[in-house]
């Protein structure tokens, strides 16, 4: 239950050179996958073998998103990350999956967690970019100009502008107003991955789910989905329901260190 403003404080207390992973950097990672694997469905079964032409096939598997038993994630560890720290270190900076087995656990007389085998994944060294827990992205805010309009997307990768203001950010487009599976991204001239049109399924078009809310408050973006989200999760799973600095037990952030080129 940490708000984004407190996330900023905590990460600076840990290391002043660190920051929350921002939308623009996350977007670049997503496009790296989309181009390398030539699909938008990162939950396709993992296949380590290349095609005869030397291309990747499949995706990164289900990740941790099959921990879908009702209330199991909460009972297991109160919505904290499931993968032990360093569990995927042997994959290095490559892409791959590794089984993680959770045994049957009797919580009390009224609740038992059923045994399940999950497949946490890495993409080019980044662990569990989807599933596990919702990622709160820095440098992006959504807000309607009035009650009858859709959310305008305000974004920046300038870390001096990482705050809750919209006046110091670029307008990148308009977010879809409906909930559902994503058909079309905003794209624009900076390859935005915010949903523009809904109307797909979990196995067609962008394959990931979009949740939004109809009010005029400033919204933050939670992405990737959580461990209980099943097919709704994925790189482009976008949730813009929450007001800026809302707290959630099943959301967190990725940290990064920015290096200036020499």
Feature annotation, model-predicted:
Residues 29, 145-146:
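Extracytoplasmic/secreted cell-surface and envelope-processing proteins
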Residues 1-129:
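Short aromatic-cysteine micro-motif
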């Amino acid at each position: 239950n940490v708000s984004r403003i407190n996330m900023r404080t905590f990460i600076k207390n840990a290391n002043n050179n660190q920051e929350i992973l921002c939308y623009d950097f996350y977007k670049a990672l997503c496009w790296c996958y989309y181009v390398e694997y030539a699909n938008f469905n990162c939950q396709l079964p993992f296949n380590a073998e290349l095609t005869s032409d030397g291309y990747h096939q499949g995706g990164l598997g289900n990740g941790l998103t099959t921990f879908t038993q009702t209330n199991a994630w909460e009972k297991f560890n109160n919505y904290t990350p499931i993968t032990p720290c360093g569990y995927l270190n042997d994959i290095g900076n490559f892409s791959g999956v590794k089984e993680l087995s959770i045994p049957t656990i009797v919580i009390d007389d009224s609740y038992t967690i059923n045994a399940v085998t999950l497949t946490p994944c890495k993409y080019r060294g980044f662990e569990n970019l989807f599933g596990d827990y919702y990622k709160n992205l820095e440098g992006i805010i959504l807000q309607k100009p009035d009650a009858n309009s859709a959310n305008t997307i305000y974004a920046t990768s300038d870390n001096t502008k990482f705050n809750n203001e919209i006046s110091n950010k670029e307008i990148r487009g308009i977010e879809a107003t409906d909930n559902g599976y994503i058909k079309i991204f905003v794209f624009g001239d900076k390859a935005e991955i915010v949903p523009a049109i809904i109307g797909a399924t979990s196995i067609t078009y962008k394959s990931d789910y979009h949740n939004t809310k109809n009010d005029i408050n400033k919204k933050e973006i939670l992405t990737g989905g959580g461990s209980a989200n099943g097919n709704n999760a994925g790189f482009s799973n976008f949730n813009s329901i929450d007001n800026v600095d809302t707290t959630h037990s099943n959301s967190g952030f990725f940290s990064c260190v920015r290096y200036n080129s020499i």
